[in-house]
């Protein structure tokens, strides 16, 4: 593994253990050239997934990109980080087990929204605002009103 600090290709594993999500291995590494320490994660990848964008462009599925967008939607929310990791791993497993190597970005977005809706409605609305490209406050109002059950006298 190449050292992210100095580029040395000869690093050493100092500690290896299951990560909190129990679907990956966490490794602490040390670079003898610069003394840098860093962490890597090893995960099983069932198949190489390709994302088909709405423009028709194809790109390799990037778990880190998925994780970043989910974590942004959950920023400052009272959600256990381990629960977020489990949700992300569940989404990736679901995508990999679909039997398809090509998956539309719209399909991925719907799966993420479904998972977020079960965990936190604020994160769900945040993600939806980007995914559905809200342009005005009315877009938020319409989306949130569809979430709420009809409340008597709330007209």
UniProtKB/Swiss-Prot annotation:
Cofactor note: Binds 1 zinc ion.
GO BP: negative regulation of DNA-templated transcription
Domain ATP-cone: residue ranges: 49-139
UniProt keyword annotations, A-Z: ATP-binding, DNA-binding, Metal-binding, Nucleotide-binding, Repressor, Transcription, Transcription regulation, Zinc, Zinc-finger
Cofactor requirements of the protein: Zn(2+)
Entry keyword annotation includes ATP-binding: yes
Signal sequence extent: none
ZnF region ranges: unnamed: 3-34
GO molecular function: ATP binding; DNA binding; zinc ion binding
Function: Negatively regulates transcription of bacterial ribonucleotide reductase nrd genes and operons by binding to NrdR-boxes.
PANTHER family: TRANSCRIPTIONAL REPRESSOR NRDR
Similarity field: Belongs to the NrdR family.
Descriptive protein name: Transcriptional repressor NrdR
Organism expressing this protein natively: Roseobacter denitrificans (strain ATCC 33942 / OCh 114)
């Amino acid at each position: 593994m190449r050292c992210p600090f100095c580029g040395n290709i000869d690093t050493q594993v100092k500690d290896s253990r299951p990560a909190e999500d129990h679907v990956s291995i966490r490794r602490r590494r040390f670079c003898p050239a610069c003394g840098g320490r860093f962490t890597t994660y090893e995960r099983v990848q069932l198949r190489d997934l390709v994302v088909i964008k709405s423009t028709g462009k194809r790109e390799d599925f990037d778990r880190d990109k998925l994780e970043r967008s989910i974590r942004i939607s959950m920023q400052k929310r009272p959600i256990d980080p381990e629960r977020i990791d489990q949700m992300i791993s569940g989404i990736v497993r679901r995508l990999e087990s679909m039997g398809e190597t090509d998956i539309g970005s719209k399909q991925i977005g719907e799966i993420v929204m479904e998972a977020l809706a079960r965990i936190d409605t604020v994160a769900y609305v945040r993600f939806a605002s980007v995914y559905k490209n809200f342009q005005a406050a009315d877009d938020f109002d319409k989306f949130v009103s569809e979430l709420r059950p009809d409340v008597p006298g709330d007209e």
